[in-house]
Amino acid sequence: MKIDVHHHFYPQAFREALEAAGGDPSGWYIPPWTLELDQEINATLNVTTTILSVTAPGPVIAKDPAAAASLARECNRSAAAIRDAAPAQYGFFASVPSLFDTALALEEIRYALDELHADGVTLFTRYGQGANYLGHEAFAPIWAELSRRQAVVFIHPTHPQDTALINRALPQPMFDYPHETGRTAMDLLTSGRLRQHRGCRVILSHAGGTLPYLIHRAATMLPCMPPDRNIGLSRDEILDTAREVFYFDTAISANEVTLSALARFAKPGHILFGSDFPNAPRDAIVRFTRFVEEEAAALPDGVTVEALKENALQLFPRLKRAEANGVPKI
């Protein structure tokens, strides 16, 4: 049995906003989603609890700040209603408007965590028109509040600045998204944002994207840089911070090469199951999940289904209490 921490849903308001904007800027399609389809895939994957989230580009598809805040509120209320109807089977990560709209974002974090009792908060890898990744100084108040609350933060990639496709066969989520996750993770590490605000537990989508593969490259070179580019941390300090703060989901990443590298890099207890339903093709989701079930345990640093579930229970006290007591908790 599994707890799925990377699992999307499409409230009607979000679907309508995407359609009004001409679709996802990344080039990905808008998949069908209903609660019935959701429950069917959960049964197929042996998922007992699903943490819902709104995928990229999220509420910022509405360009007006007030409209984006209203869309985030509608998405969060929709998620809470699903959770309230089946609290042992569902939870959710809250949506927020653009982090540049600090007051609006902080208010939605407060509302979602205090009044709706969300299990965490979704942030996207980049906001605005420029290279504004999550270590940007404008986002420091957001990180300070999330750290104060010791929140679980689910980081999901969104489209890069350049939305031009390599070709029609490669919409950006297919290959570019993992690079965006690696970029924002390294920005958080090199900006000092994570060391300043240590209270957050941060889930990186898709096995951390390119971070586990490339972090040693950057961490080894950074201490050798000239003073104006030297962040004052040793290689081991950079690696230790990443291992301490970051968790990683397996969504669309469960294969021998990727999971072997991730298991060697991640701190024990920091790998979680994720499906990426409904955005990934169903057959691909099933194939990746079967690898987790049937082959991952045999890897050199084996990853078992039981361990993935226990890791999630440790991260989400509500679910751990429900498991211990045998009753749903909100």
From Swiss-Prot:
Annotated Zn(2+) binding sites: H6, H8, H156, D276
Keyword Cytoplasm among UniProt keywords: yes
Major localization class: cytoplasm
Any one GO biological process: secondary metabolic process
Described purpose of this protein according to its UniProt entry: 6-methylsalicylic acid decarboxylase; part of the gene cluster that mediates the biosynthesis of aculins. The pathway begins with the synthesis of 6-methylsalicylic acid by the polyketide synthase (PKS) acuA via condensation of acetate and malonate units. The 6-methylsalicylic acid decarboxylase acuB then catalyzes the decarboxylation of 6-methylsalicylic acid to yield m-cresol (also known as 3-methylphenol). These first reactions occur in the cytosol.
Family according to the record: Belongs to the metallo-dependent hydrolases superfamily. ACMSD family.
Protein name in UniProt: 6-methylsalicylic acid decarboxylase acuB
Organism: Aspergillus aculeatus (strain ATCC 16872 / CBS 172.66 / WB 5094)
Gene: acuB
